[in-house]
Amino acid sequence: MGSDQDIDRPDEPNREPTEGESHSWAVEALRSDLRGRPRPEPAEPERQEGRIPQTRIGRSAKLGTAIGGQATRYAGTAAANVVRSDEKAQERLETRHIETALKMASTLGEMKGAAMKIGQMASFIDVDFLPPEYREIYQKQLSKLRTHAPAMPWERVRMVLEEEYDERPESVFASIEEEAFAAASIGQVHRATLHDGSKVAVKIQYPGVADALESDVANMGILLRLARALAPGLDAKAVASELRERVLEELDYEFEAQNQRTFARAYEGHPFIFVPKVHSRLSRRRVLVTDYVEGRRFDEVKELEQDERDIFGEIVFRFCFGSIYHLQHFNADTHPGNYLLMEDGRVAFLDFGMTKRLTTQQIQLEQRAMDAAGRDDPEGLREALHDLGFVADTSRVDAERLMEHVKMVGGWYLEDKQTEITPKLVMRMIEVTSDPRSDFFDLVRKESLPADELMGRRMETGLLAVLAQLRATANWHRIMREWVYADPPSTVLGEAEWRYFERRGIGQTPGLPSRV
């Protein structure tokens, strides 16, 4: 639930502006943040009063205005600045971008669903629709979609509780706070106390969000069909079906509870990974109740010393990839709001609404592909990617260029060396796979994205972006070898984890014969 638990408390100083605070205060607050100055006194916050827009046309138009409209405003302001003095032009341009960032965050926050997820991703992944020189302004404002998006009024979400429990919330909980402490893309979270005194987090699904997500998925289907013009090998129908299936699962909190129970059992007592316990008796299709977790949010972790950020990054890396090999199951929703650094040094992993299970055969094919790339075997790599579904016709794809392309994208864990993950590195990887100007774009047009691989690539992209925000450094290759070849642990954390899984009797997918 963690994007759902990670939020500033109302009484904390220097909190981010919330929806409804005065426009001028919000602009000056963000400007002060960027320049390291104290903020002005905040205005009184308000809640989101309106309903979530639900129709396909309505949501598509609103999303287009939020994202596409800013490009038009950017161009117009830049043109007008030609006739102004440099200093005044710079100030006006900065103000325009601050206003646009505020509007974008507000609109995406009100829309919830997939639209809000786009905003969350843009807050930590460098994307093309944000002007590079003003990206910090947008990312700082959009980051509140991970931590404190506009919450719905208690009266509206209370109705969901009453419908799901068929009784008053006051009968179910000893107490429940009417003020949400977190608001995410599909639901918001309230602190509560059970009758036995246990502190819990109660995630309540927004009324109307199911219809909104149905519209988002339909709009995504249209975009995927258009994407075939750029990537003819893309099976748009299969990818759209996979997206729809994962979204429907995310809407079912009982399914999420089942996922979270699986991970919580597997990592119970783990030395550095923590997954909160689910209260199954109180969880419903639109209500999820878990143990409440305290911890430092990602923005605070980013300010820690390098060695602490490296440890945090390795823990996230081991959770994201390690669960594939130990559980044949991974969490695809890798964004910074889903991680909390606990007081004892463990990292709490939250929100299991979007996960993916893999077969032994799928994992072994991935191992084959990584092995071929690591051994510099172009023919073997092409064959492995063909078996995975990335290359439909091997005769149309040059094996040497394919190897070069794969090393550009996966070099960070294919090369046996210490590698710092930076935003520039991640942007370069994204460009070689999606930019029509890339030297490899003709190759990309001959490749495909198998529906079964969609969530894996989503996880990997999100993980990379998280590591880039941390500027985490490690020999990612040596850690990966622990799973691909069943090599001995390569770090102190790896040794602790190996002892844990051995003690618990949790094995992993058999590794390939080790090749050094």
Language-model segments: which ranges?
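Broad phosphate/nucleotide-binding scaffolds in NTP-utilizing and phosphate-metabolizing enzymes
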Residues: 1-321, 342-348, 354-356, 360, ...
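Short adenine-binding "F-helix/F-box" segment of the Bergerat
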Residues: 363
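Catalytic-loop of the protein kinase fold
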Residues: 326-336
